[in-house]
């Protein structure tokens, strides 16, 4: 029987629930983009929380068939955006509350992490990096930063003080008439452009 960790991440624009084996194999990842009206450049935090609360049960129902024959060893939640002491966004409370509740019901540990650490961990998995210290360039909607990771310690080395890379992508996409967040839609256009040559 596979032992899995159930992960929750409720960021500004995506509700995510996943199951990963304790060895690091992704069993399933269930995500839903939050709806943003065409032409708009985001949601208020209260709207984001409302959408996450509605989407989380559906994501868990979607995940359930993949983990029926698994033992849930732990739960992990993105409780805030970054490792900074003042890092806070209400949207993260939806996944944090759901995850902590699930862990309590199952009698398993619940580990708290940050959305930023999740991005870095995903990049490590995708690139095949298992262990070791690294430099990470974190480009997202809310951050454009250079970080050093030594062991588990993240140190901010620098970043932008103005517009973040993700904001540029989203604003460009919205100006082109694409839905927000525009990253996935621009990526699809780029792939189509390459295939049409």
Task: State where each predicted segment sits.
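Alpha-helix C-terminal capping segments
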Residues: 97-109
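Short, well-ordered amphipathic alpha-helical segments that serve as non-catalytic structural scaffolds
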Residues: 30-32, 51-66
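A short helix-loop
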Residues: 3, 7-11, 18, 27-29, ...
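Conserved phosphate-binding catalytic cores of ATP/NTP-utilizing and phosphoryl-transfer enzymes
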Residues: 1-3, 108-135
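Short glycine-rich, Thr/Ser-proximal phosphate-binding strand/loop in the N-terminal lobe
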Residues: 11-50, 155-156
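Acidic, glycine-rich active-site loops and adjacent beta-strand->loop/helix elements
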Residues: 14, 78-83, 114-120, 143
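Short beta-strand-loop/turn "lid" adjacent to the catalytic site in phosphate-handling enzymes
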Residues: 64-100
